[in-house]
């Protein structure tokens, strides 16, 4: 499918939340649009500290530029903290306050840029009013699966859930059972998150969801029927094939092991496990007897080497030195997942990571830690049956080493029998769908053609 030369001049502004879990899908969307429609002009709005990284993520030679934003000073927000990766859990709220104070700056920029559309994130709930005053249309881009959008489009939103049991009942009505500890986590963010999302949906001209009917058919139908605004699907926005080579240190280590034998374990850049979770996870990986590559992250202001020594079980590093790596810091995750020796992915079920796992041949073992990760995991494990979730205690989410071992064992051993056989086949079918370039391009083309017609 080639649409080059078929592009009416169109100018889009991208304004994601200052978190790379949000910035990345906006970049991927930009890259896919510019590949099919090189005449479409795209302008990114980003915090100054993130500009260079975003520029390296964008396709070269595209009609896309990044404009740095100045983040206002807020008491208590450390200087230089301009995205959630640099913020502590205590200062993320202050980062959002600083973003809210950018409204005059954003209005001035939009008045000068005069784009056709602004594609914005849920934290920027105030943007539709600003854009409307300037005669600019707005698109709310949900980087979440449709199951997270549902409470904000549901007719139940007039009576928001206020207890743990309310949350459990609401999610059950969507066909997604959640445990008590998950409902507590969801309830803690429900009011602010869905209040913002409500304002985004009701204020925008149209809503764009990073999902597809092949993965969430009935929920997408419900969202489309209940939404106050037109709903467009962009598909799961599968990342482009990775470029460059895997770091030689990691490549040499992975090359030592047979195909599909290594467990890669990571929880993203913004999830910090507790001491108990680190201990049980490490011991569970050791119990499998398989080689593993464990990535652990700690807050920016701590000594990572000291934290690894403090939190890992006594003698652990010595016991696993021949078949285990424990690392803290950034790694080339997509390169590692694509390596021939990697056969299992133990992770937090962040949506972007789910897609990265599905397009590779590594079996998914999910250990969700917060909000949308809980429901993402249920969709993959219980509905699509393309992975498994680590069993956890209902009241507090505790998991032990045996729970980790049993989850890995269920997909990595005795693969010719159930449940591993069916899980692997379902994974294969999803991978085939996600790697169908024509289907993915059609989502982008349908979206852009609809924008041209508006």
UniProtKB/Swiss-Prot annotation:
It comes from the Eukaryota. InterPro entries: UDP-glycosyltransf_plant, UDP_glucos_trans. UDP-alpha-D-glucose binds at residues 269, 330-331, 348-356, 370-373. GO terms for molecular function: UDP-glucosyltransferase activity. Its EC number is 2.4.1.-. Keywords: Transferase. May glycosylate diterpenes or flavonols in leaves. Belongs to the UDP-glycosyltransferase family. This is UDP-glycosyltransferase 79A2. It comes from Stevia rebaudiana (Stevia).
